[in-house]
Amino acid sequence: MEESFMVKSVETITELIGNTPLVKLHRLVSDDSADVYVKVESFNAGGSVKDRIALNIIETAEKDGSLKPGDTIIEATSGNTGVGLSLIGAAKGYKVITIMPESMSIERRQLMKAYGTEVLLTPAADGFGAAVAKAEELAAQPGYFWARQFDNEANPAIHYQTTGQEIIKAFDGKTPDAYISGIGTGGTITGVGRALKEVNKDVEIIGVEPEEAPFISKGQKGKHRIQGISAGFKPSIIDRDVIDGFELVTSDDAIETAKNLAAKEGILAGISSGAAVTAALRVAKRLGKGKSVVVLLPDTGERYLSTGIFGEA
């Protein structure tokens, strides 16, 4: 497996995005199951997998001229992309405005504001589409750059270039038998899936959706508590051809697994991480001993303390 995670000296905070560690699970995995490794994306500078796409979207736009000095970056976000854009905007000197449903966790709003971002809230009852509509309205004005994470090819591209390659390197040029991640924008599973399938066409790429709202797999909308996945529409950047199957996880199971990750493995991760690990444990059981599964943990559980899922203070 990959070499130990090492501290290094860097010139800017953005250099601390990527090269996140893989950690093997022990107490949650049964003896007759495949090995399960979690890719802990909270080790990124801004604390989530979305730091990767935020940096690539901004730097790609700088190179092609669509983002100019003095422009304001705007985005509709469930939180993590907004935090990533806020961090990078602060480091590079851009003003950032984010739009998010009011139902998202308070920690995410606070984090964005800490970086100097202006946060606009849309009614929870209107769903994520209302946040996107507001971003589109602002983007029509001059001097605004809309990150468009659901449609921007810089999103899956960075996961192909970095996240997927990191997994391949960790497996000495090969791949695990299965890779699992939740589907929000679809950028992570698309980019990583493409990278892994170039090396091994037989690797299983499994997407995770809420059982209450499996929109990508079944076209069904519904209320759920797994923040960050199942936006209720199909992002244009998703490559369905790279996805071999889906695992549907209830909100209750996702929360319970997130709690168990913290209590039994010492890994504090968010609700969508709980959903992904729930799915990974099922797949590991099906594959059996001697096989390997990698599952991506998008963020840290610290962003969900106010929801009470880990207990009241």
Pin down the residues of each PLM region.
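PLP-dependent amino-acid enzyme catalytic core
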Residues: M1-A313
